[in-house]
Amino acid sequence: MAKYTGPKLKQARREGTDLFLKSGVRPIDSKCKIEQVPGQHGAGARRARMSDYALQLREKQKLRRMYGVLERQFRRYYKEAARRKGSTGENLLKLLESRLDNVVYRMGFGSTRAEARQLINHKGVLVNGQGINIPSYQVRAEDVVAVREKAKRQDRIKFALELAQARAEAEWIEINAGKLEGVFKRVPERSELAPDIQENLVVELYSK
């Protein structure tokens, strides 16, 4: 599946919820009618009652788009989650949360996950002192993630940190804003993640 390059708000409208694809400077409902489906007839169209399969597919698409993962990679995450002990759905969320681009976003070094990916791709991030330019890199407990010295002067990072202060602090991450570095203390528990994600629907979809 090709990378989506169209309007990000259109994706949010398709899923009917904020996917955190924009910086959050303004509330998403001030930018678009989130409850209105995209398309020519969106203004008067109602969201049709969906079949079980359609609900499962929509939830998978929502989760995949939220974390910025392509279909093939998302399926690999699911297979890895299924191999691990415990709940497959929770394992899937933990794998996604442990991605380096997500951790950089959670630490406030990128205003969106896409911006965090760009910072990583441009070799602006260190993990335990080593340069890592792979957004999907799996961060482990006690790993130290830092912005490379030459990237610290970027205004967008300062802006992202200001935005991050308005978000709920992630208890599993310790941040030193002055040094632009943080510690991934542990993998988050399911109760600490977004309650509106129905990962069980994703498991049902892939279990068929």
UniProtKB/Swiss-Prot annotation:
UniProt xrefs under PROSITE patterns: RIBOSOMAL_S4, S4
InterPro entries in the record: Ribosomal_uS4, Ribosomal_uS4_bac-type, Ribosomal_uS4_CS, Ribosomal_uS4_N, S4_RNA-bd, S4_RNA-bd_sf
SUPFAM superfamilies per record: Alpha-L RNA-binding motif
Gene3D superfamilies: Ribosomal Protein S4 Delta 41, Chain A, domain 1, RNA-binding S4 domain
Residue span(s) of domain S4 RNA-binding: 98-164
Highest taxon in the source lineage: Bacteria
Keywords assigned: Ribonucleoprotein, Ribosomal protein, RNA-binding, rRNA-binding
GO biological-process terms attached to the record: ribosomal small subunit biogenesis; translation
A GO MF label: rRNA binding
Keyword Calcium tagged: no
One GO CC term on file: small ribosomal subunit
Subunit relationships: Part of the 30S ribosomal subunit. Contacts protein S5. The interaction surface between S4 and S5 is involved in control of translational fidelity.
Family annotation (PANTHER family): 30S 40S RIBOSOMAL PROTEIN, SMALL RIBOSOMAL SUBUNIT PROTEIN US4M
Function field: One of the primary rRNA binding proteins, it binds directly to 16S rRNA where it nucleates assembly of the body of the 30S subunit. With S5 and S12 plays an important role in translational accuracy.
Family statement drawn from the similarity comment of this UniProt entry: Belongs to the universal ribosomal protein uS4 family.
Name the record gives this protein: Small ribosomal subunit protein uS4
Organism: Nitrosococcus oceani (strain ATCC 19707 / BCRC 17464 / JCM 30415 / NCIMB 11848 / C-107)
